Regions:
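Leucine-rich solenoid repeat scaffolds
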Residues: 181-244
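Surface-exposed, short loops/turns at beta-strand junctions within beta-sandwich domains
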Residues: 18-29
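Short, exposed coil/turn segments at beta-strand boundaries within extracellular/luminal domains
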Residues: 35-43
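Extracellular beta-strand-rich solenoid/capping regions of secreted or surface-exposed proteins
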Residues: 74-86, 95-115, 121-138, 150-152, ...
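Generic recognition of long tandem-repeat/solenoid scaffolds
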Residues: 10-14, 43, 96, 236-244
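Solvent-exposed loop/turn tips at the surfaces of repeat/solenoid architectures
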Residues: 72, 87-92, 99, 110, ...
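Acidic Gly/Asp/Thr-rich repetitive segments characteristic of extracellular carbohydrate-active
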Residues: 6, 45-70
Length: 244
């Protein structure tokens, strides 16, 4: 079942996609809890996002707490999130390859869930970090995140932010060693002076082993009760986080 809001109406489809005719159309509401036959529908209603402009508008709309992409979008300017928000990429791609800033997708506060799609910075400037958390809590689930930088990482956290990685694939495609300290290109990184927290409860990491923690502060990015195992993923050396 898929629920989404478009043009002031709530659309519900039980077996199709957002491009198929809806089974039920209701007046717009931000939350729903109804029973129809043997089906119960409840929860926040995601707003459909078709462009970077729609994305920006959703961030300033206090009533919008859940969004879903209906196509690939490209982000050039910074998207700054400062509220509770669920972001479902719907299997689509957010491209950061035309980014004009180093932190194009940045969480500053709130509880944010980012899931079900791809964040691609493969051809961005090498100072671009695809996902940044500078405050609040960010959950990453069923994502593929690509960076290609010898200076930065796929995910960066600082200023008291917390990143919880549940699942997904995180790959730094850089061919050179890490610019600042040598070794494998970074996949995860935290600020040295304004520390954040990264907890890995799952995921596949192609680049530096998350068990080795930060390049300067040490520690580990693997959550308590979990471990990192060396694997081969699509012909590449990788590390997979699993329960002990």
């Amino acid at each position: 079942m898929i629920m989404y809001e478009r043009n002031g109406k709530l659309f519900i489809t039980f077996n199709g996609t957002m491009n198929d005719p809806a089974d039920i159309i209701l007046s717009k509401t931000d939350k729903i809890n109804v029973s129809i036959g043997d089906k119960t529908i409840s929860g926040n209603i995601p707003k459909v996002i078709s462009s970077a402009e729609d994305f920006t508008t959703a961030l300033t709309d206090s009533d919008t707490t859940s969004i879903v992409l209906e196509n690939n979008i490209s982000i050039a300017d910074q998207i700054k999130i400062e509220k509770d928000l669920r972001i479902d990429l719907g299997g689509h791609i957010i491209s950061l390859n035309n980014s004009t800033v180093d932190t194009p997708l940045r969480i500053d506060s709130g509880n944010v869930v980012l899931s079900n799609g791809t964040i691609d910075a493969t051809f961005a400037n090498e100072t671009v970090v695809p996902v940044c958390c500078f405050g609040g809590t960010l959950e990453l689930n069923n994502l593929t995140v690509y960076a290609k930088t010898s200076k930065e990482s796929c995910v960066f956290c600082g200023w008291g932010g917390i990143v919880n990685i549940i699942s997904g694939v995180y790959e730094n495609l850089a061919k050179d060693k890490y610019f600042w300290a040598g070794g494998s290109p970074l996949v995860l990184n935290i600020s040295n002076d304004n520390v954040g927290t990264i907890n890995c409860f799952g995921g596949i990491f192609i680049g530096k082993d998350p068990a080795l923690g930060d390049d300067r502060l040490g520690g580990t990015f693997v959550a308590e009760g979990y471990k990192s195992e060396k694997i081969t993923y699509q012909g590449k050396k990788a590390f997979m986080v699993i329960k002990k």
